[in-house]
Amino acid sequence: MTTMAIDNKDKKVLNVPHLRFPEFSGEWVTKSINDLAVVIGGGTPDTTVKSYWDGEIQWFTPSEIGKNKYVDSSLRTITEVGLNNSSAKLLPPNTILLSSRATIGECSLSLRECATNQGFQCLVSKKCNVDFLYYLIQTKKKDLIRKSCGSTFLEISANEVRKIQVSVPSDVEQQKIAELLSLIDERIATQNKIIEDLISS
């Protein structure tokens, strides 16, 4: 999201994007994901125990996220008993569901409380506009893949996600950027819906 700009007066490299809203100035601050969010993994209840499944808790897998900014309903659900008897965690609304396996770096925002399987390192924002963080983490997909490891399949750990470095502006600028990118996403979704309707008609 950010690239280095040059102050022609002092020939100093600044940590700011080349394109920026004119009302903002000053450098962006470098922080780690750990500074901005709590990183939480997931888990899978025992699939042989019927009482763990078909409950009220949405339970996402990596194949269900990344296609849209927001996700609401999952293909499978788990019960509170299943949640408590697994490493799955109950995540609050507006959690960034970040895939840490398979297609590493895919993400969506949850609209409600939910849980995930172990193929995630989810981000619960603590010091950052969650929409801004959603767009920001997508610019770090190459870093996420590069820091992944594994003999059977690539996976990035919670600790490696926490170490990812990002550049962050003020809260007001975060909100402005997030609003613009969200508007663009909405326009794209509207156009895609129009195309789908035309194809199906």
Language-model segment annotations:
Residues 137-166:
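Specificity-determining recognition surfaces
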Residues 16-43, 59:
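Non-catalytic DNA-recognition/assembly elements of restriction-modification systems
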Residues 46-54:
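Short coil/turn segments at secondary-structure boundaries
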Residues 3-4, 33, 133, 150-151:
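Basic chromatin DNA-binding modules
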Residues 1, 21, 25-34, 162-200:
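Amphipathic alpha-helical segments
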Residues 1-19:
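Accessory (non-catalytic) regions of SAM-dependent nucleic-acid methyltransferases
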Residues 43, 55-56, 61-63, 70-138, ...:
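A short beta-sheet element
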